[in-house]
Amino acid sequence: MRVLCLFGLAAALWADGPGVILSHRVKSDFDLTADPNSGVWKGVTGVFAQNGPKGDPTPGHRTEIRSVWTPEHIYFLFIAPYQDLNLKPNPSQDTETNKLWDWDVAEVFAGWDKQNIHRYKEFQVSPQGEWVDLDIDRKTPLPEGGWKWNSGYRVKARIDEKNKIWYGAMRIPMKSIDPRPPKEGNELRINFYRIQGSNPRKFVAWQPTHASSYHVPEAFGTLRLAK
């Protein structure tokens, strides 16, 4: 019995081990908020991204990512410390901003098909609440890089200038990432990134890509839908 208990404990720890983020089930969809201490977000255990894409330390930019889900949507919250901001002039929260990655952003790259890892979706949010979503095909790139694809996702962001942290939240329709019926235990291939500041720009990756590009699906981690 003791052996079985220890085995069960080890399995539980492994299920939430390195390279794995759990997205926690919530009862129903909710008004999107970028406040980590409000409602659903409070108490959710996330993961941290603190190094560059090649595994090099990025001091002062240790980013927390939290996730929850419903049958209709998957939600993400980025808690993003910064040293300086690099913001696009004249931001628009009402229309998509192509090439938003030229400025400060937090990013989710997510796909479901483990047999076709070159196909995935990209979602970005800026500290000013700008957004862009892209349909990515690394083997046969889509017209204009896939940015004219529209997932129907929503974002919310705010900047805490006093504490030098910005917060970005996303609500993404589940069907825009994964055609399977959502259920506990489903897994996505996923990675999280940031681009921050200027002179020099800072780059943060949850799972290192070991390349200058973020578009290395072989390096993605795992998101698991949990209770």
Q: Where are these predicted regions, by residue range?
A:
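Sec-dependent signal peptide recognition
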Residues: 1-7
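Hydrophobic h-region of N-terminal signal peptides that target proteins for export
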Residues: 7-15
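Structural preference for beta-rich elements and adjacent junctions enriched in aromatics
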Residues: 15-227
